[in-house]
Amino acid sequence: MKKSVYLAGPIENCTSKEISQWREECSAAFLENIVAINPYRAEFESTYAETKKRIMMKNYMDTQACDLILAYLPKEINDRRPSYGTVFEIAWGYSLQKPVVIVSDDDKVHNHPLLFTSGALFYTLECAVDYINILLGEYRSVGKSGNPPALGAGDREFESLRSDQ
């Protein structure tokens, strides 16, 4: 079954590379049953006054629909301007009872009481992706039939080992 991860992170006042590179790397590193939801996928310049409200509503709907939120708050960008949108997305995830995984190389993020208690915290994207792959990855079958072993099958195996003694 496919699982989805919403990729929350800075967009406003960021370069194209700062917006896209980490999202592309994470998407490529997820297991094949994990799909990334990129909030930047449908952004465009518009003079329409409601654009910011539309973006916020789209992002909220994406956080509702996803299975997990991965939030990236790098120190270099936080020092220029905190990503208020990303903090909103973390709060949405928390209130929607979604697992939230936060990645930051900024000790202020790791020590902030609201962020510290809202999800799993990591210093690197690699560690976070590994954690997500474990949480959302599909179990591999180990039986000859191609199906996972039946519940309790391990107990029977253990009992047979004990009876040989």
Region spans (language model):
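Short, intrinsically disordered, low-complexity terminal segments
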Residues: 5, 147-150
